[in-house]
Regions:
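Chalcogenol-based redox active-site neighborhoods
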Residues: 1-118
Length: 118
């Protein structure tokens, strides 16, 4: 899942909900990867401070390149939009949602979609 900024209110809230429900995601055989344009050093401190045990990836340099490839880089703000992509074991995109920078996603949607995939 892409998120705009580490340590921001909405991003931290979204990731903390997923942290607290991580057991449910792993029970559904899902792996969570979270990515923003923050540096790996920021990501490390953010993960330690919030107790995240899932990987936080840094799309730092070239700046936003991964987000650009997914078509969700906001060139004006210089960050990724809130994009979530569920990819199956074969690398096939099964579901996605993209929200604006200020708009939090509903984690229940992830649970519902993952429960329907084989």
């Amino acid at each position: 899942m892409f998120y705009p900024w580490s340590f921001s209110r909405v991003c931290t809230g979204e990731l903390c909900v997923l942290r607290d429900d991580l057991g449910l995601l792993t029970d559904l055989d899902a792996q969570l990867l979270a990515i923003s344009v923050d540096s790996k050093y920021v990501q490390r401190v953010f993960a330690e401070r919030e107790g995240f045990t899932f990987p936080l990836l840094a799309d730092f340099w070239p700046h936003g390149e991964v987000a650009r490839r997914y078509g969700i880089f906001d060139g004006v703000a210089g960050v990724a939009l809130r994009g979530t992509f569920i990819v199956d074991r074969e690398g096939v995109l099964r579901w996605s949602i993209v929200r604006g920078i200020p708009d939090a996603r509903d984690a229940q949607q992830y649970r519902d979609v993952l429960a329907t995939l084989d």
